[in-house]
Regions:
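Long, acidic serine/threonine- and proline-rich intrinsically disordered regions
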Residues: 143-146, 158-165, 414, 418, ...
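Membrane-embedded beta-barrel scaffold of Gram-negative outer-membrane proteins
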Residues: 425-427
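Ser/Thr-rich, Pro/Gly/Ala-heavy low-complexity intrinsically disordered linkers and tails
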Residues: 25-104, 108
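Exposed acidic/Ser/Thr-rich ligand/metal-binding surfaces
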Residues: 24-29, 199-419, 475-480, 570-580
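Bacterial N-terminal signal peptides that target proteins for export
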Residues: 2-10
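C-terminal motif of bacterial Sec signal peptides marking the signal peptidase cleavage site
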Residues: 19-22
């Protein structure tokens, strides 16, 4: 029987997915269970579930935040069991990256989608060279007997999806290390029940269309929607990169267009301040009420590029100014518009991220908005947003700017949940093993789920978050005999009063449709998006899926659902199929 325990309310997210592999097994030794990729959704013939993928970058994040990633075989995402944590360390595989790397145009010929003998397309654009991404690896199966708990911080970033679109617009596949599946799925809206206040969890599911041995279960968490007129006044500080690297139409030109859209949408009582940085930083505009909109727009229009890139100085000056104009009754945000490159002062992304941690704790949140491609630093932009208690978006077109600053303005500005994290507890009598797709750099120690001092994720009004698990059932389990396979716990802090709220919902097999065609269309959409990401990042678990079959599903969804976003996805998958 489905139950829900709600203590209090406020926030927004949406977790999609859980894959239940049928209890099969031709393993002769019933006492010994080995989870292999070909037992799962993606029908891979690659690594076994005994291989743990853990990146050095994950360890860095865990050390900074107290979080640990769940990437591994019979080990854990955290450690309800110290021995399992040791196993995780000892069994680290070689498919996790962890190092930030400068990525040239195209794919690596060895193992990339171009193939060993195929060069990148002839029209490969030099603008796509020298970008910095971090390979966080991918997660492997976790033995539910060793650790039935999967714990991670929520993440509403969408930058990875838009970065992918930019690469395909240039006629190239994105680098695998640039792909973060959760950010792909976050880029779409799903039809979840909306609570009047707080969060609500819902669960549904169905079989995978790509492997008849597996099932998908969606766990959706939706937060309250706040009308723009009901939000408090906003004090925004724009920190704008005006260095020489921004001297392109898709950089400073698009920054000007984007911030002008934002200013036009703000209320008269809101304020905007502008800090720019190149070799050093400077204040272009002191905090100014939107009533003086023309003055603000003129200041934006007058921006000119030149010089080196002292991101550290820009952030320090921006946060100082934001502190001086802090509104206790309102919204306080720094909006960083940059290509992420830093070559003067502090340049290490992790050091920069730690530098702003205290300001985030004081209630000044950071939104990082990436622009340009070619000499673009995705790592810095994403890490700053994580440590700045905000989110990371990438703007490649004016349409994307309108989505971020016009259509989703209140979500962009108003935080309704702080330090939000999820813990899924699987029943080891039912579930043999599970694998979380994505969130490789958002892991939290299992034992830290109820430690409210641990930094986790922030969500804006109406935001949704999506996660996907692949799950193998224990041999002999009859799905008709068991009502539940696990339980989802969601915990966050109300930013208004500081109260900590926790809700839970059981994963009920009766919520799972037996036929793919009977599942909700938005459930099918989330599945296609997540699988697309797995294919693009060369995850061995996706090797068994033909991208042409995925393109067929996307074509069908574009016809049935329609809308700009789904049509765009359909086109992107078609283009990726043509390049692979």
């Amino acid at each position: 029987m489905k139950r829900s325990n709600v203590n209090t309310t406020i926030a927004s997210l949406a977790i999609v997915g859980l894959l239940l592999a049928g209890c099969a097994g031709d393993d002769d030794d019933a006492g010994e269970r080995t989870t292999t990729a070909d037992d799962g959704l993606f029908d891979d013939r690659g690594r076994s579930g005994d291989d743990l993928v853990r990146s050095d970058a994950d360890a860095d994040v865990a050390e900074q935040t107290g979080d640990e990633q769940t990437d591994g075989g019979p080990s854990v995402d955290g450690s309800s069991n110290d021995m399992s944590a040791e196993m995780a360390e000892e069994s680290a595989g070689d498919t996790g990256g962890g190092e930030a790397s400068s990525v040239p145009a195209g794919r690596d010929a060895e193992g990339g989608l171009f193939g060993a003998d195929e060069p990148p397309p002839d029209d490969a654009d030099a603008r796509l060279e020298d970008n910095t991404f971090r390979d966080y690896g991918y997660r492997d199966f976790v033995d539910a007997d060793v650790d039935p708990l999967s714990t991670f911080a929520l993440d509403v970033d969408t930058g990875s999806y838009t970065v992918m679109r930019r690469w395909l617009d240039e006629g190239q596949l994105p680098p695998p290390e640039s792909v973060r599946p959760e950010e792909f799925v976050n880029a779409f809206d799903y039809d979840y029940d909306t609570p009047r206040r707080g969060l609500e969890i819902s669960v549904d599911g169905g079989p995978s269309p790509f492997d008849d041995r597996t099932w998908l279960v969606r766990v959706g968490v939706q937060g309250e929607i706040v009308d723009d007129e009901d939000r408090g006044p906003a004090a925004l500080t724009f920190v704008i990169d005006t260095s020489g690297s921004m001297d392109r139409d898709d950089r400073l030109g698009l920054v000007k267009d984007s911030l002008s859209i934002l200013v036009d949408e703000l209320d008269d009582d809101d304020t905007v301040a502008i800090v720019t940085y190149d070799d050093s930083s400077g204040i272009v505009l002191e905090p100014t009420e939107i009533r003086d909109r023309d003055r603000i727009l003129d200041a934006i229009d007058d921006l000119r590029p030149g010089g080196s890139t002292n991101l550290e100085a820009g952030l320090r000056e921006g946060y100082r100014l934001a502190g001086e104009s802090f509104r206790r009754d309102g919204i306080n945000r720094v909006v960083l518009a940059s290509d992420g490159v830093a070559n003067v002062g502090v340049t290490d992304p992790d050091q920069l991220a730690r530098m702003i941690r205290d300001d985030a704790d004081r209630g000044i949140n950071l939104v990082t908005v990436g622009f340009g491609m070619g000499n673009f630093d995705d790592v810095t932009m994403e890490q700053l947003a994580d440590q700045g208690d905000g989110f990371y978006a990438y703007v490649d077109t004016e349409d994307e700017a309108e989505r971020l600053f016009e259509d989703e303005l209140t979500s962009t500005l108003l935080t309704i949940a702080k330090d939000a994290k999820i813990q899924v507890e699987f029943d080891p009598d039912v579930v043999a093993a599970y694998r979380l797709i994505g969130f490789e750099n958002r892991g939290v120690l299992d034992r830290d789920f109820r430690d409210d001092s641990i930094d986790a994720g922030e969500l804006g009004a109406g935001h949704q978050v999506t996660a996907i698990y692949e799950v193998e059932l224990e041999r002999g389990v009859d799905v008709d005999d068991r009502d539940e396979v696990g339980e989802v716990f969601l915990r966050w802090e109300d930013p208004d009063d500081g109260n900590v709220i926790e809700i839970d919902e059981y994963i009920d097999l009766r919520d799972i449709e037996p036929d793919w065609t009977d599942t909700p269309e938005d459930f099918q959409l989330a599945t296609v998006v997540a699988v697309f990401a797995e294919i693009l990042r060369d995850n061995p678990y996706a090797d068994g899926i033909d991208i042409g079959d995925l393109a067929d599903e996307a074509d069908r969804l574009a016809d049935e659902i329609g809308g700009r976003d789904v049509d765009d996805l359909d086109d992107l998958i078609d283009r990726a199929a043509g390049l692979s």
